[in-house]
Amino acid sequence: MSLIRRGNAFDPFSLDLWDPVDGFPFGSGGSSSSSGSLFPRANSDAAAFAGARIDWKETPEVHVFKADVPGLKKEEVKVEVDDGNILQISGERSREQEEKSDKWHRVERSSGKFLRRFRLPENTKPEQIKASMENGVLTVTVPKEEPKKPDVKSIQISG
């Protein structure tokens, strides 16, 4: 059993899902068994979906999401808001067209999809979300609403 993930740690499309019982004899979904499993090994497409690494930080003014998407063009990445408060970041890298005359010696770059969803806090302005991409890093900025100041009402004391 290994705690180290298989695949290239710098490629969000190539990571396998870690199986905590991989290698045990009682039917893990890992390489040691192909039968039913408590934790079935994901196929490469499912692993690609889970593999996208995204950081989320909050500042006093905004929420910032940063995703490593090396090799993707901005046309291959989607940023959407679903139901007003679910931020969805997805992308797809297609396979390179192969010519019959091509002879491949090594294929390390993978193709696949990823999809990540985040529930935005109530104090955000989803209609003002901005996204940019530079050097293989997608940055999504979600502005926050200014905190509401409590209404203070003076009560006149009688008597």
UniProtKB/Swiss-Prot annotation:
Primary localisation category: cytoplasm
Superkingdom as given in the UniProt entry: Eukaryota
InterPro entries for the chain: A-crystallin/Hsp20_dom, CS_dom, HSP20-like_chaperone, Small_HSP
Example of a GO MF term: unfolded protein binding
One Pfam family it belongs to: HSP20
GO cellular component: cytoplasm
Keyword Cytoplasm part of the UniProt annotation: yes
Family the UniProt entry places it in: Belongs to the small heat shock protein (HSP20) family.
Self-association and partners: May form oligomeric structures.
Protein name per its UniProtKB record: 17.7 kDa class I heat shock protein
Encoding gene, per UniProt annotation: HSP17.7
